[in-house]
């Protein structure tokens, strides 16, 4: 019987619906549609890029407790009620959350550049001091290059699991030479080179 009265009360045209039911019937988050949030988020990012993030943070206490403060938080995945409650109870925490998330968004935008520069510098290895250096390749015509299998007895073959060096009997003659010795130089004995000092 009590349920009928509630349903009759809702069905009456003359009675205005209760405020809680009215809130449930209408979308109270309609102001936060994606079309409205995107321009605000873009505006926030433009301010961050221009260095005017401080101005946005200074204006925060005026906006604390309103739904318009939510897009400035940078898309935190908490429900809107939790953010609003946090902002209402502690404006300092809300401004800290805005600054943290704003800088987090800015840092995420910079991440691909940082990762690409660090990976290119770390891939150089031990000889990465001069990035213009080309990797030396085997000639393919000398006797060690023509050998197809490892010997299995040299130190490089025995340490195959830990070391990454080629078999000593398969190492190219060109690679045995140091890169700077490709020019023909006559060897000079050390005593004769400094004979004019004595």
Swiss-Prot record:
Residues 114-134 are annotated as: Disordered. GO terms for molecular function: methyl-CpG binding; PDZ domain binding; zinc ion binding. Zn(2+) 1 binds at residues 139, 142, 145, 172. Transmembrane segments: none annotated. InterPro entries: CXXC4/CXXC5, Znf_CXXC. Residues 161-166 are annotated as: Interaction with DVL1. Keywords: Cytoplasm, DNA-binding, Metal-binding, Wnt signaling pathway, Zinc, Zinc-finger. Zn(2+) 2 binds at residues 151, 154, 157, 167. It holds the Pfam family zf-CXXC. A zinc finger (CXXC-type) spans 132-173. It is found in: Cytoplasm. GO terms for cellular component: cytoplasm; cytoplasmic vesicle; nucleus. GO terms for biological process: negative regulation of Wnt signaling pathway; Wnt signaling pathway; zygotic specification of dorsal/ventral axis. Interacts with the PDZ domain of DVL1. The CXXC zinc finger mediates binding to CpG-DNA. Acts as a negative regulator of the Wnt signaling pathway via its interaction with DVL1. Binds preferentially to DNA containing cytidine-phosphate-guanosine (CpG) dinucleotides over CpH (H=A, T, and C), hemimethylated-CpG and hemimethylated-hydroxymethyl-CpG. PANTHER family: CXXC-TYPE ZINC FINGER PROTEIN 4, ZINC FINGER-CONTAINING. This is CXXC-type zinc finger protein 4. It comes from Homo sapiens (Human). The gene is CXXC4.
